[in-house]
């Protein structure tokens, strides 16, 4: 059974795609902490990020860096934070979150409720900054 993220990559479940290459995929978190909150995943279905090969883990970080730099251009912030939790979906993923303060990285914070138009606009802004 494919994970929800594999189904997103396959186009079976819609998403707000930000970036993609042959190995990795970036899309907006549908329960964002702040505008611009993006997930980066390997297309390869791996549950635990540290089960990726060293080369794939390094390549995922380089891909995430490109996305993070674009997020920072699209949503001016002090830094783009990175978090890896990995308990909520059994598919390795990196959260990229534009931060004004460390409080923006608290996953216990209430999530934003955005409209489809807002999500589309956010994804477009980040993609355009790539």
Language model region names:
Residues 1-130:
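HIT superfamily nucleotide-processing domains
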